[in-house]
UniProtKB/Swiss-Prot annotation:
This protein's pathway: Amino-acid biosynthesis; L-histidine biosynthesis; L-histidine from 5-phospho-alpha-D-ribose 1-diphosphate: step 4/9
HAMAP family: HisA
Name of this protein: 1-(5-phosphoribosyl)-5-[(5-phosphoribosylamino)methylideneamino] imidazole-4-carboxamide isomerase
Location of the protein in the cell: Cytoplasm
GO biological process: L-histidine biosynthetic process; L-tryptophan biosynthetic process
Keyword Metal-binding attached: no
Active site per database record: D11, D130
Keywords of the record: Amino-acid biosynthesis, Cytoplasm, Histidine biosynthesis, Isomerase
Source organism of this protein record: Acidothermus cellulolyticus (strain ATCC 43068 / DSM 8971 / 11B)
Length: 241
């Protein structure tokens, strides 16, 4: 199938499905059971789910058993993210049977390790590029991780298969996607890009879908779906427009 793949987000904190504003701890809006959310997105037609352990991302705990249960219970592909920074956390994540993992902070803080795991696992590894004003954010978006395009060039050279690009300032705000950022990343790499952050309307979905020829293959949507701005089915239809 051509077109843009929609990945509904299920972010987990304290065992609950939540959404944050600009990735900031303490801004959570709770949406109940993450397993029920994941099963609901599957029932609505999702082919992928973006599943995040926010507690692990912020270094304040883990929901690993719950995430493993969710991956086991759904029949769709899962992209697993949050706190995957070393061999043990990567082993646990891959052992869930997820389709791929998204590595964020470690790609900035431990480039030698990322080079090794990318070489070993290939398509199973995506690297999250969380961007604020042209700089990369690390450790749950609270620390600076360096200049975006310098890091991107290094990751490309290391053979990274895919990038998940988030504009931190827009995530969870319904403020619209950063199309310029996505264009710039696509121009700088020939690897596929999954976009994330700020989707507020079906027009936003169509705007990102227009970037498919440039290299954008997927779009993560969270708050707009949970807030009922549009349905997953409507988003999937807009993504093929």
């Amino acid at each position: 199938m051509t077109g843009l793949e929609i990945l509904p987000a299920v972010d987990v904190a304290g065992g609950q499905a939540v959404r944050l504003v600009q990735g900031a701890a303490g801004t959570e809006t709770r949406y109940g059971s993450p397993l029920e959310a994941a099963l609901a997105w599957q029932a609505a037609g999702a082919r992928w789910i973006h599943l995040v352990d926010l507690d692990a991302a912020f270094g304040r705990g883990s929901n690993r058993e719950l995430l493993a249960e969710i991956v086991a219970r759904v029949d769709v592909a899962v992209e697993l993210s949050g706190g995957i920074r070393d061999d043990e956390s990567l082993r646990v994540a891959l052992a869930t049977g997820c389709a791929r993992v998204n590595i964020g902070t470690a790609a900035l803080e431990n480039p030698e390790w990322v080079r090794r795991v990318v070489a070993e696992y290939g398509e199973k590894i995506a690297v999250g590029l969380d961007v604020r004003d042209g700089r990369l954010a690390a450790r749950g978006w609270t620390k600076d991780g360096g200049e975006l395009f310098e890091v991107l060039a290094r990751l490309d050279a290391d053979g990274c298969a895919r990038y998940v690009v988030t504009d931190v300032a827009r995530d969870g705000t319904l403020g619209g996607p950063n199309i310029e950022l996505l264009r710039a990343v696509c121009a700088a790499t020939d690897r596929p890009v999954v976009a994330s952050g700020g989707i507020s309307s079906l027009d936003d979905v169509r705007a990102v879908a227009a970037l498919v020829p440039l290299g954008v293959e997927g779009l993560i949507i969270g708050k707009a779906l949970y807030a009922g701005v549009f349905s997953l089915r409507e988003a999937m239809t807009a993504a093929q427009a």
